[in-house]
Curated annotation (Swiss-Prot):
Domain of life: Eukaryota
Name of the protein in its database record: S-adenosylmethionine-dependent nucleotide dehydratase RSAD2
Key words of the record: 4Fe-4S, Antiviral defense, Endoplasmic reticulum, Immunity, Innate immunity, Iron, Iron-sulfur, Membrane, Metal-binding, S-adenosyl-L-methionine
Localization annotation: Endoplasmic reticulum membrane
Length: 354
């Protein structure tokens, strides 16, 4: 018996389809059995390689910039030998652009802004700084606005105009011996840095601004006993830093400072801390605690990543936003909390006792 081509053709096609389906099903079953067998035997299935840097950026992407240090200028009138944020540019953002960036930070969760330099009172004789301080307190309603300064450019009229909007003023003072300050480079002509410190402390008391002192411990002041003068000045906080090297700033071929001769060991730093352990307001910061525990914005509003011992900038928050820029900051939030980075930082909540 013979089948006509017309009748035979659909049957052949059906057989082909069934055969193909059998092959596909066999392949699927084989693959499932392979992975299942591997899992049952405790073997590890192949996984794509993990981009650790990407994972780190995802973690940092979710970070809140609670406390930010904005170094809006690099220019300074002092020449401290260990300075780790030197005058490599003279750039300062226009006021409105700086305000725009600060607003972005507030919208991302910033509670505290610290203005630093360089010397922040140098630009426009402190007016630029004053306007930023006022904007952050009045317009942004930030709980804490603070400044770090060498104190040489501060006038009483600045307190009269902007003191109400400032929570904390930190003055850098590494020694209470004028000869030592000369060696370090924290000096301006014949002016007494220590006398000026006392004057500013009195203005802080008069205009109700919390007074803080920052000291960098180095080879020239590590043996000094500062107990009596610190007790007399009675700051709300005495931040004591171990001298830190940053490549490209105070170390390396492209640096404007050579800070190697100022560096002290961990043991010598600890000995200084032990001698001053009776001072309750002392807040120590070793190199380990300091290096990655600050969110630092440079003059272009770029976050600076210090993990590699240098300052690697992100893109500006003005261009890419806070969320993207902060993912390249290298910020160690755990170390920030460990070093006491979050404290009572609004003068409204402080019991200022003079």
């Amino acid at each position: 018996m013979q089948f006509s081509p017309v009748v035979a053709s659909p049957k052949l096609l059906l057989q082909l389809c069934i055969s193909t389906l059998h092959c596909i099903m066999a392949s699927i079953i084989s693959t499932v059995c392979y992975w299942t067998a591997g899992a049952c035997k405790g073997t590890t299935s192949p996984v794509p390689p993990v981009d650790s840097n990407l994972d780190q950026r995802k973690v940092q992407n979710a970070m809140t910039p609670t406390s930010v240090n904005y170094h809006f200028t690099r220019k300074c009138n002092y020449k401290c030998g260990f300075c780790f944020h030197t005058a490599k540019t003279s750039f300062v953002l226009p006021l409105e652009e700086a305000k725009r960036g600060l607003k972005l930070l507030k919208e991302s969760g910033m509670e505290k802004i610290n203005f630093s330099g360089g010397e922040p009172f140098l630009h426009e004789k402190g007016e630029f700084l004053g306007k930023l301080v006022q904007f952050c307190k009045l317009d942004l309603q930030l709980p804490s606005v603070s400044i770090v300064s060498n104190g040489s450019m501060i006038k009483e009229k600045w307190f009269q105009k902007y003191g109400d909007y400032l929570d904390i003023l930190a003055i850098s003072c590494d020694s209470f011996d004028e000869a030592t300050n000369q060696l370090i480079g924290r000096t301006q002509g014949r002016k007494s840095h220590v006398d000026n410190l006392h004057k500013i402390r009195n203005w802080c008391q008069q205009y109700k601004v919390a007074f803080k002192i920052n000291s960098v411990i180095n080879t020239f002041n590590m043996d000094e006993d500062m107990t009596e003068p610190i007790t007399q000045l009675n700051p709300v906080r005495w931040k004591v830093f171990q001298c830190l090297l940053i490549d490209g700033e105070n170390a390396g071929e492209e640096a404007l400072r050579e800070a190697e001769r100022f560096v002290i060991s961990d043991q010598l730093f600890q000995e200084f801390l032990d001698r001053h352990s009776s001072i309750s307001c002392l807040v120590p910061e070793s190199n380990e605690k300091m290096r990655n525990s600050y969110l630092i914005l440079d003059e272009y509003m770029r976050f600076l990543d210090c993990r590699a011992g240098r300052k690697d900038p992100s893109k500006s928050i003005l261009d890419v936003g806070v969320k993207d820029a902060i993912s390249f900051s290298g910020f160690d939030e755990k170390m920030f909390l460990k070093r006491g980075g979050k404290y009572v930082w609004s003068k409204a909540n402080m019991k200022l006792q003079w």
